[in-house]
Amino acid sequence: MQYTEIMVRYGELSTKGHNKKSFIDRLGVNVRKALHSFDQVKVHAQRDRLHVELNGADYDQVMNRLKLVFGIQNFSPSIKVDKTFEATAEAAAQMIAEQVDKPITFKVETRRSDHQFAIDTFEMNNKLGGYLLDKFPDKLKVDVHHPDLTLRVEIRLNGIFLSSETIKGAGGLPVGTAGKGMMMMSGGIDSPVAAYLGMKRGVSMEMVHFFSPPYTSPQALAKAKQLTERLAKYSGSIKFIQVPFAEIQETVKEKVPEGYLMTIQRRMMLRLAAALMIKRHGLAIFNGESLGQVASQTMESMLAINDVTSYPVLRPVLSFDKTEIIKIAQDIDTYDLSILPYEDCCTVFTPPSPKTRPNVKRAREYEKRLDIEGLMQRALDGIEITEIHPGEDYLNQNEDVFAELL
């Protein structure tokens, strides 16, 4: 069956009151961005539904893109027919013939926005349901409460639209409706999941990745970019900000006691992330910390690290077990990349026994040994920004260096 359009139903947007229009407008922009490669597709974002006119585009390909767009509760492929009962009945019979191969229960559910149409919703439900029962007596039985199949009929000004399938969307809120966040992106399992969860709540993410050549390899940088590419399919594109961090790590290792290396390094990372957030008009910093998962992720450690900024530091996976984080990573296709064995700057210079309950005052005292302003300025002067789009391959750009490790 050649579908005419896809009817998209909103998720939480239906509860947004006076802000609903801005949320719907943003969702329309995001859907158009997700479907930009389909030249013939037209997107119409309306108050109660979003309609994607296929105009001959491949339904399966369009559907796979829509599944990744946050803010969509579900959607249904539909066909458009002339505004007559005869055309509606013929199309409905074709749908049943193609989709039903064993006895099932069903119901007809009609919405009518064109109140000039001669048949009202109650009459359409009864008349069309009776027609289908007569035509398929061995296949169909009515159940209005828990049917196996719901045949939806929408009577609009420009035609009648029929659908019988409902496909689950990504849920959440449209990316961009909650403002911009700076994600402290490592190459591990947790931070891509945290970024995904933040994006699902409407945050437009920019990735901040600290790299420390020669202590970290080109492979580690390429892996972080490829992880960002996996996440870009949820928002269209993501800016990746790489921050040189080797000088800071070397200086901290030289001047700070071993037990506080991790704490001071992370305080410097947070300072840099906050500086970038201000410069790039963000509203919050995100990271992948999970309470108690490793020695540096205690509440005392978080308190000592957060001391350097008054801006919000949000941790979407804070209360998740590792198994829960891994499950999400597998679902969003980042897990296999995350476990590739390339060290990032969070794992180099790691002391054997970091302080699990660092003292804030002591951390401040140790930092007096550092030229914090100079170190930060040189790091910020060396940043590089890459716009990462879905489908880009950063691993093959490093094929030679990867080959010896794979």
From Swiss-Prot:
Domain THUMP: 60-166
E.C. numbers: 2.8.1.4
InterPro entries cross-referenced by the UniProt entry: Rossmann-like_a/b/a_fold, ThiI_AANH, ThiI_fer, ThiI_N, THUMP_dom, THUMP_ThiI, tRNA_STrfase, tRNA_sulfurtransferase_ThiI
SMART domains: THUMP
One record GO biological process: tRNA 4-thiouridine biosynthesis
Principal location class: cytoplasm
One GO MF term attached to the UniProt entry: CCA tRNA nucleotidyltransferase activity
UniProt pathway annotation: Cofactor biosynthesis; thiamine diphosphate biosynthesis
Annotated Gene Ontology cellular component terms: cytosol
Residues holding ATP: 184-185, 209-210, 266, 288, 297
The family this protein is said to belong to: Belongs to the ThiI family.
The name this protein goes by in its record: Probable tRNA sulfurtransferase
Organism: Limosilactobacillus reuteri (strain DSM 20016) (Lactobacillus reuteri)
